[in-house]
Amino acid sequence: MTAILASILVSVLMLIFLLLLTKDAFSFSVRSFSMASIGRLLVECFPLCLGAFLLIYLGNAPKYAIDSYLSSTMQAYYTYLFMPCFVINLLVGFVLQPVLVKLTVLWEQKKNQAFLKYCFLMHLAALGISLVILLGGAILGCPVLSLVFGVNLNSYSAVLDVLLIGGGFFALAVIDQVILTIMRHQYAMLWGFGLASLFATVLSPVLVKSMGLMGAALAYTCSDAILFLIFLLFILFYYRKERCSLQSVPKM
């Protein structure tokens, strides 16, 4: 509880500091505001808030199972092996951020072919990054992690490989989450988050109890794969629906 309160306090202080630091860079005035509009905005953003929470939960569900069935040493090993997954997400973020505005403009202007092309290129870039890191992890991952953390992780190379595959699925799911948000179908994401979280909650303890760290890695990877596939199906469904609706509009 102390850590949570400290985190909240630091966040509030940082917010105040940044507002004071940047207040002269922006000039705007608010003459009036509508509580109804604010309420609608909060309702529209609710799936994004819940999704951010559940994304974190998907990564932590195997850790909860490890905490219940394995030793603290195994928990530490899993944390060490999980570190390279953040590299995939970091690099994919560099690919994703520059094209967000472009994707939004293309979708709003009904340029569906160009929109689909950019989506494909983003998935291709994420897949390429994931494959490069997976290859590097297979060759150097465990030796480097063993050197960094001062423990012998060489016997867990298969666990690292599975986790890196899961990291790739996670990055693809994040891309699809952004695409669905741009398409204004963020509520559809709740199905993906719900099913993936249910899988992680139910099967993480079973897999960890029977397979140890490999079970935790499989639970993480399968949960992210489920999330990615559901999001991808929704994207294809809504894209096809949008294209059909445009084709049905009579030309003037």
Briefly describe each language-model feature range.
Residues 1, 165-192:
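Membrane-interface junctions at transmembrane-helix termini in multi-pass inner-membrane proteins
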Residues 42, 79, 111-128, 135-140, ...:
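Interfacial transmembrane-helix starts/ends
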Residues 47, 62-64, 76-92, 125, ...:
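Alpha-helical transmembrane segments of polytopic membrane transporters and translocases
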Residues 1-24, 194-199, 213-237:
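Hydrophobic alpha-helical transmembrane segments
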